[in-house]
Amino acid sequence: SKRSPKHLLLLFGEEEKLIDQQMKRLKHMKEWIKKKSGIIRRTLTEETGVIRVTEEPERYMVMTRAEKSDERGWAEAVGKLWDYCEEHKIRSAYSIGYRQETANILEEEYERYSVCYQLLDQKPRSGVYTVRPQGKYLTVCHKGHWKDLGETYRQLVQYASAQEIVLGAHCYEDTLFDGLVVQEERDAVTRLGL
């Protein structure tokens, strides 16, 4: 095509749109990095194994159920959750968390997960979400493999019983340090909230 002022203006207009898109993407990346850094900093200051009653804010979650509760079933559920979040442009600096029924925990059944979730700081613009209610939660940070959570759950239940704390219907496992943050599974940190 010929060089002309009109052609150059069209070219500049297209370039400006591309730059705006890149700036928007970079802004989202920067926000994600800041939030993820904040999660890591807070986790580094949190003592593992210390049980606390914590006032928690209302939190938004996008959730999915696993068809089967074996490793493959959970891998598929997490994949569905990621696809759903991608489809609805839901981004979060939080790692995937898992929810169990408190009744199962009280029966010492520590691997009967019902749901995996993506925790969010804000209500998503589209799609289905659930609200984790604000209120007092019995919390503890567990360091180590998720298959070793049973002992930490036992301690939580004993503490609740000794303090006569009424537990809610669900237990939330917020993954704070996962494979993105630590190299070894033994260094993983999961925050339990009952």
What role is predicted for each listed range?
Residues 1-3:
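Short amphipathic recognition helices of helix-turn-helix/homeodomain-type DNA-binding modules
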